[in-house]
Amino acid sequence: MRVSTKTMSVVALAAISILAVDQAIAVPPPTARVGEPAPQFNAQDITGKTIRLGDYAGKTIVLEWTNDGCPFVGKHYDSGNMQALQQKYTAAGVVWLTLASSAPGEQGYVTPAEAKADLAHWRATPTDFLLDPNGIVGRLYDARATPNMVVIDRTGRVAYMGAIDDTPSTRLADVKTAHNYVTAALDALAAGQPVAVTSTRAYGCSIKYSDE
């Protein structure tokens, strides 16, 4: 059977259209970019309540990815550094959201009960602790290691993303001499000044996503 050129063109166009749709579906969600609006998300906290980023519109927000078995995270909690930051800045009106994005069965995953126990053990006081076992929020913000930090300004734009400081070690003593990027960003925003360092590479333990 002869197939006309017109018929072949229609088939080709249909194939291209299907391919385009498949590719569009396969494209991952956009990740956060410094200076651009922070990607919106919702996640359940450790009480089962759904928390939306938009709930905190107009406020400065810190996103802190954590892992209770990571020595790099342990450095900042065992030294009391992370708790001190949480207390200082939440008292000043900053919203501090701690997140766990490792998949079930992977190192770093926590149940609500385990997350509550971690907060009690560390005497941590974030605004909330969000659970992200499917990794949706972590991928949106390209979180790859713990601790991974993001600062969002009052206009809803990403002001800083990356490491907590400039000293990638597990030594508690290094906290005192390290330059803390999160502190610098928050203080600059509070003073109405531009953030000097807006992006760094996070160091620490890798976040174990479900398909990686």
Please identify what each model-predicted range represents.
Residues 41-61:
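A short beta-strand-turn-helix
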Residues 74-122, 132-140:
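Structural microenvironment flanking redox-active thiols in thiol-disulfide oxidoreductases
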